[in-house]
């Protein structure tokens, strides 16, 4: 798209093109996530911004929140900041496989519990949380349910209504296959979020406060029209290709890699692989070698791109016992191949022999 105006700011053709494209993206994402209203799909730059909006806009001093050890700093740091305002947080602990005990939701529930705020899947281990089970718990106790779907959106089905999700936060650049700088939050009917950022909206100019209706309520300033157009194209690709086909391919590669490295002497793989339903990532270490050294060797000697270090998941690393070493994470996407996967297996085996 070579030319696009500023959505919602003018009536000329370029501006209207932007408005129509952005609304089409709202409709596509609402359909993908089971969000009842397209105008409740609010765009942000990424899931970090979306989570900040949701967490700061839903909680008040005196509230209590349930979360888990699986969380990314995009959930953790906003929650820690809310603790400074008088919000209390209880984290469901993870075991050495990175799994939680769902009975801990009942154990940690308090009279002032306001919400469960958690990831759909660990970005480190690939372990998934049972959103339907957690959503049913929230519905039974009148709690808000805020989900960080950064690791699963576009690969695993999400139905906000069926899973009782109050706010779904997503990023465009991961499994949705969209451009960097895109993301958003889908807000269920009846959920009121205080605006995190206020300013120009192009409508209701004489109001001293942010307009009350979604999506304008949470969208101050110019939207990333070109990025959202790219995200729309990506969602259309997912719909045309089929989420099941995408997931089947990615999980097959991840399983192939896991089975190829799990028994290699000196290799330690993290996460629960007893279930076939898990995010298509595999995190490992080779003996006591620093994860960054392994990642550098993979990049320089084998042209294999991985991520090493702490992965913005400090509580998960504490649970796994990898705070000092970190971990090397292999991620498998729709455009990866069996040949690339086998090359990665061979590289890990060679490095483990050194």
Predicted regions and their residues:
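Pyridoxal 5′-phosphate
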Residues: 1-354
